[in-house]
Regions:
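A Rossmann-like FAD-binding core segment of flavoenzymes
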Residues: 78-85, 181-290
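Beta1-alpha1 glycine-rich phosphate/pyrophosphate-binding loop at the start
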Residues: 1-77, 163, 173-211
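C-terminal, flexible cofactor-proximal segment of oxidoreductases
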Residues: 326, 330-424
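Rossmann-like dinucleotide-binding core of oxidoreductases
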Residues: 157-212, 216-223, 230-232, 320-361
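FAD-binding core/adjacent interface of flavoenzyme oxidoreductases
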Residues: 1-3, 76-162, 251, 262
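Alpha-helical membrane-anchoring segments
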Residues: 411-574, 588-593, 598, 603-615, ...
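Short hydrophobic core segments
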Residues: 5-7, 100-112, 130, 166, ...
Length: 658
C-alpha cells in the first residue's frame, strides 16, 4: 500500500488531494494507495473571502466547507490533527495526536501573518488569516459600535470608533473597503454619526496594491477616499500598543489613538514549513525550494505546493507569487507527477504557471482588475471585474464541492444579501413572504386541473387529436400571415400539409399580423384574431416558430396514431399532476418547473393567447419556496432532504442543498 500524506487543507492541499484521488482512480490503482489529508480544522476555509465575514456582509458559514463533505465517496482519509514535525529521513510525520508514515508527502501548510519585528504588533492587533480571525474581528467591530453608543466619555468614544488597517495590499484594501461599506449600516443601527467614525488604511509604500498597474492603484485609492477612508501612504508602523499606534512618516515618529488595529501587512510560511525549511533547502520567509516538478530539491518524494513553494519559472526574474492561482496550478501539477511516480505511466509535468490577472474588491459593490492571457491583458471596469471575481469563485467551487457550494455561494452573495451590498445591489435579494404566494399557487394549480379535465371531456383519452390540434393552429397563423402579405388563402393552407378540414375552416377567418420576425433559428409571430379595434386579450396570440420543434412534431409526435395517443395521455396526466401538486403545495418546485416547460411547448407549437400567458409568469413566481407556507412541502421537504443527503452517490456528486 502506497501512503500519500497531504499536510494542509487550504486551496492547494484540497485541490491536490481531489485531483490525485481522481487520477489514481482512473489509472486503476486507487485500491493500492491511501491518501490522507491532515489539518488542524475539520473544514476548508476560503481565505480570500474572510473580509466579507469580518465586515458582516455574509455569514461565517459561507467561507468554510466541511472536509468530510468535500471528500465524501472518495478514497481519502481526513485526519484532524496539528502536525508539529516532519522527519524527512524517516518518511514520518509527528502530530499532536499521532504519527503518520508516508511514501509521498505533499506539503501545503499555507502561511501565517508576519509582523516584521514591529513591537506590540502581534500582541495588540487583529489579524485576518483564518476563519477564527474573521469571526473575532467581526464581533470586535460590532462591540466597538455597541459600546460607543453608550459611552459618555468623548475621548473613549472616539477611541472605540477609530479603526486602522495596516497594509494596503489585497487583504488590507479589501478589509478596509468592506469595513467602510459596513460602517453606515452600523451607524444607522446604533444611532452614531458617520463623521464620528475614523477609518485609516496605512502602508509603507507609495500606492495601494502595488502589483496593480499604477492607474488601477489610483482608482483603488480614490474609491477608498470616496468611502470616507483616510489613506496614509509612505508611513511605516514602528510600534503598536493596546490603544495606540506609532508610525514613522518621513523622519518624524507620530503616535495616534486607535481602538482597533487590523494587521494585514504580509505573510510568511506557517510554523511547520518554517521548521522544515531549517532542514531542507529553502529561501526567504520559510519557502522551500522545489525543482521543475515541484519536488523538494533534497527529497524527491516530498512535493511542496501553494504558498510554501519557492520556484522561479524559466525566463522569469521573480519566484511564483503566493496567490490562489498559483495554489491551483501547483496542485494540478503535483497531483499529476505523484500519479506518474506511483504508476510509472505517463510523463512528469514541468511546472509552467500561467497567471491570468489580478483583481481587488473594495466592498461588495466595486472592484477593479487586470486580466486576460499572459501577453494580452486589459483593465476591467468595476461591474465586469466583480462579475469575473464571482465567476472565478464559482469555477473553484465546482471543482471542490460541486452544485451544493455553488448554490450556497450564490445564495449568500446574491439572493440573501442585505443592505444592497452586492454588485447587483439588492435587486435579487428582496424577500417576499411566501404566504402571499399561496393564492397564486392554488389558482395556478386549479387552472391546470381545469385544463386537464377539459381535455379529457374533449376526448384526449379516446382518439388521436394532436394532428387536428397542431394543424388548426398552424393554419390559423399561416392564413393571417398570408392575408397580410397578399397571398391567396389557399396557398397558405396548402403549405400546411397536416392541416385538417377543421383547421382550414379556422384559417378562413384571417385576423391581423402585428409582428413577424425571422431570426433564422426561430421566428416570432404576434397576431390578433380580429381587427385591432375589436380585439381583446383573448384574441391576441404569440408563437415561437422553431424549425427543430416543428420537425420533432411532424416526425415524432405525429408519426403514428399510437404516438399521438401516448403524448396526449402524458400531457393530460402532467397537467393533473402539476395542478394537484401546486394546489396542495407538494413538490412545488418540480411542479412549477414542469409548468414552465409545458408552457414553452405550447408557445412553440400552437402559441399562447395573451389572456393565458399569465400562467408562465405565475409558474416562475412560485418556483422557489411557494410550497413551504400552507403547503405539504413544509412537512415533506425537510424529511426528504434529511434522507436524500445520506445517499452515497448524492454525497459523492454533491447533489444536495444545505
Amino acid at each position: 500500500m502506497t501512503n500519500i500524506v497531504v499536510v494542509g487543507a487550504g486551496y492547494a492541499g484540497v485541490l491536490a488531494t481531489k485531483k490525485l484521488e481522481k487520477k489514481l482512480r482512473k489509472k486503476g490503482v486507487a485500491n493500492e494507495t491511501q491518501i490522507t489529508i491532515i489539518d488542524k480544522h475539520p473544514y476548508h476555509t476560503m481565505l480570500t473571502e474572510l473580509h466579507e465575514v469580518a465586515a458582516c456582509r455574509v455569514g461565517e458559514e459561507s467561507v468554510k466547507m466541511n472536509l468530510d463533505q468535500i471528500f465524501a465517496g472518495r478514497k481519502v482519509k481526513v485526519v484532524l490533527d496539528t502536525v508539529n514535525k516532519i522527519h524527512f529521513e524517516e518518511n514520518k510525520i509527528t502530530g499532536e495526536n499521532g504519527e503518520y508514515s508516508y511514501d509521498y508527502l505533499v506539503l501545503a501548510a499555507g502561511s501565517k501573518p508576519t509582523f516584521y519585528g514591529v513591537e506590540g504588533a502581534e500582541e495588540h492587533s487583529y489579524t485576518l488569516w483564518s476563519y477564527d480571525d474573521a469571526v473575532i474581528l467581526r464581533d470586535r467591530i460590532h462591540d466597538c459600535f455597541r459600546l460607543a453608543a453608550d459611552e459618555p466619555n468623548a475621548q473613549k468614544r472616539q477611541e472605540l470608533l477609530t479603526f486602522y488597517v495596516i497594509g494596503a495590499g489585497f487583504t488590507g484594501v479589501e478589509m478596509m473597503g468592506e469595513l467602510a461599506e459596513y460602517v453606515p449600516v452600523l451607524c444607522e443601527r446604533f444611532h452614531i454619526k458617520r463623521e464620528d467614525v475614523k477609518l485609516v488604511n496605512v502602508d509603507g509604500l507609495s500606492r495601494p496594491v502595488p502589483v496593480l498597474p499604477e492607474k488601477l492603484s489610483g482608482k483603488v485609492e480614490r474609491r477608498l477616499k470616496k468611502m470616507g477612508v483616510e489613506v496614509l501612504l509612505n508611513a511605516n508602523v514602528v510600534e503598536v500598543g493596546e490603544n495606540f499606534i506609532k508610525m514613522k512618516e518621513g523622519e518624524e515618529v507620530k503616535q495616534y489613538t486607535a481602538g482597533t488595529i487590523v494587521w494585514t501587512a504580509g505573510i510568511e510560511s506557517a510554523e511547520l514549513t518554517a521548521e522544515a525549511a531549517k532542514e531542507i533547502k529553502s529561501a526567504g520567509r520559510g519557502r522551500i525550494e522545489v525543482d521543475a516538478y515541484l519536488r523538494s530539491v533534497d527529497y524527491e518524494n516530498v512535493y511542496v505546493i501553494g504558498d510554501n513553494m519557492f520556484y522561479t519559472a524559466p525566463g522569469e526574474e521573480n519566484p511564483v507569487p503566493q496567490m490562489v492561482e498559483n495554489a491551483e496550478h501547483s496542485a494540478d501539477a503535483a497531483a499529476n507527477n505523484i500519479a506518474v511516480a506511483i504508476t510509472k505511466k505517463g510523463k512528469l509535468e514541468e511546472y509552467a504557471p500561467k497567471f491570468h490577472g489580478i483583481m481587488v474588491c473594495v466592498g461588495g459593490r466595486w472592484a477593479t482588475a487586470r486580466g486576460g492571457m499572459a501577453k494580452h491583458q486589459m483593465n476591467l471596469p468595476s461591474f465586469f471585474a466583480m462579475f469575473a471575481k464571482h465567476f472565478i469563485n464559482i469555477i473553484y467551487f465546482i471543482q471542490v464541492m460541486g452544485w451544493t457550494k455553488v448554490c450556497s455561494y450564490l445564495t449568500h452573495e446574491i439572493f440573501t444579501i442585505r443592505n444592497r451590498r452586492s454588485f447587483v445591489g439588492g435587486h435579487f435579494s428582496n424577500c417576499t413572504p411566501s404566504f402571499l404566494l399561496v393564492p397564486l399557487r392554488v389558482w395556478l394549480g386549479a387552472v391546470w386541473v381545469f385544463e386537464a379535465v377539459m381535455k379529457i371531456v374533449e376526448g384526449w383519452f379516446q382518439k388521436p387529436m394532436l394532428s387536428e390540434f397542431f394543424g388548426g393552429a398552424n393554419a390559423w397563423y399561416n392564413s393571417i400571415i398570408a392575408s397580410y402579405f397578399g397571398i391567396a388563402p389557399a396557398q397558405s393552407v396548402d403549405a400546411v400539409a397536416s392541416a385538417t378540414a377543421a383547421g382550414a375552416d379556422v384559417a378562413a377567418s384571417a385576423g391581423t399580423l402585428l409582428l413577424d420576425w425571422d431570426f433564422g433559428l426561430f421566428e416570432t409571430i404576434f397576431v390578433s384574431g380580429k381587427d385591432l379595434a375589436s380585439s381583446t386579450l383573448a384574441d391576441y396570440a404569440f408563437k415561437l416558430n422553431i424549425p427543430f420543434v416543428n420537425w420533432s412534431v411532424d416526425n415524432m409526435v405525429l408519426a403514428s396514431d399510437g404516438m399521438q395517443m401516448f403524448m396526449q395521455i402524458v400531457i393530460v396526466l402532467l397537467e393533473l399532476a402539476i395542478g394537484l401538486g401546486l394546489m396542495g403545495g407538494l413538490f412545488t418546485f418540480p411542479s412549477a418547473a414542469v409548468s414552465v416547460i409545458l408552457q414553452f411547448m405550447f408557445l412553440s407549437t400552437t402559441g399562447l393567447y395573451l389572456n393565458g400567458i399569465w400562467m408562465v409568469f405565475a409558474s416562475v413566481a412560485v418556483l422557489i419556496g411557494a410550497g413551504r407556507t400552507i403547503g405539504l412541502d413544509y412537512y415533506v421537504g425537510p424529511f426528504l432532504k434529511k434522507h436524500w443527503k445520506n445517499v452515497k452517490w448524492v454525497k459523492r456528486w454533491y447533489l444536495y442543498n444545505d
